[in-house]
Each structure stands twice: as C-alpha cells, then as structure tokens.
Design a protein with these regions (language model features):
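C-terminal amphipathic alpha-helical interaction region
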Residues: 8-16, 30, 59-129
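N-terminal interaction modules that seed assembly of large macromolecular complexes
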Residues: 15-48
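Short, charged early-sequence alpha-helical segments and their helix-coil boundaries
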Residues: 47-63
C-alpha cells in the first residue's frame, strides 16, 4: 500500500479539479451531471475523513448502552445497531434509558456531518453546541 497520496487526498484532488477546471466549460444537463459527480466525490472524501472515528465512538456508545463495555464482543457496528433496535422493539430500551437519547442525537449529527454537512438544520445545531 502506498503512503502518499492518501485516498482522501486523491478524491479531494479529483473533485477540486473537476469543480475548478472542468465545470466552467460544461453547460446544460451535463453540467448538472458533473455537479452530481463532484458531490459524490466530496461525500466519499468526507466518509474517508470522518467515518472511522464516528463509527468507533458510535460502537463505544452502543456497547455502553447495551451493557457490553469491558466484554470481549466481536460484533460489527451493524450487529450492535441490530441489538439496539431489538432492545427498543422488545421494550427493554426506551427514551428513558440513560444515554439513549444522547446516543441517537449524536449518531444523527455524526451521520449528517458526512452525508449533508450543508443542511441548514444541521448547521443551526452546530452553532448552538
């Protein structure tokens, strides 16, 4: 595996090149399709930059909520979320469960940071934190 450039640097460089060098010359529907492609590259860049850390903190919060901290559990993040959903469906967990509401809120904010960082409501919430 090569150290430089990183996948994040590569996707950002391609997006910047398309945005700054190619977009001005493209018109009509192709300009729209190009903007969609650039947005997808920006999304991948954010995923590469932010997702690992947010997944790790989400898994830690889920482990605590599910009473698994300190245990040797090898479940994936999807497994932990499935266990959370099952706990909610079974009535074992609800919004009165300490930490659940904060976990759901933080998970939503972390996902918006990757998927929709320019979403007006997300930006407003960041200003209030």
């Amino acid at each position: 595996m090569q150290d430089e450039p990183t996948p994040t640097e590569l996707t950002k460089a391609v997006a910047d090149f398309l945005r700054n060098e190619i977009t001005p010359d493209i018109k009509g529907h192709n300009a729209f399709k190009l903007r969609v492609a650039i947005n997808m590259l920006d999304l991948v860049t954010r995923q590469l930059t932010l997702e690992h850390a947010s997944d790790a903190t989400e898994a830690a919060r889920l482990s605590q909520l599910l009473g698994l901290q300190g245990l040797d559990h090898r479940g994936s993040l999807a497994d932990l979320n499935r266990a959370l959903a099952d706990g909610i469906a079974d009535g074992k967990l609800d919004l009165q469960t300490p930490g659940l509401q904060a976990h759901l809120w933080q998970t939503t904010m972390d996902k918006l940071a990757v998927d929709q960082p320019n979403y007006a409501s997300y930006k407003r919430e960041l200003e209030q934190e």
